[in-house]
Amino acid sequence: MNLNEESRENVVFMIEEIKKKLQVVNGSVLNPDSVDMSRYEDLRDIYDMIKKKNNFSVSEMDAIAVELGRLRK
């Protein structure tokens, strides 16, 4: 999968991977369909950062949630 290409399929993939990595209990709060495609690069940045880390503090989780919320349409 080439994440350099902006596509809805890539958005779905990244959101699903983020949910797995962060162990999101209520996955419906991260709906790939609600992501604004003009914010694709921001989502990619969040995805890349999350994939590099193994553990997240509570404050990091909160900050990630806020940033993901900003990607909504």
Swiss-Prot record:
InterPro entries: UPF0435 (IPR009507)
Pfam family, any one: DUF1128
Source taxon at top rank: Bacteria
Family: Belongs to the UPF0435 family.
HAMAP family given in the database record: UPF0435 (MF_00829)
Annotated protein name in UniProt: UPF0435 protein BH2488
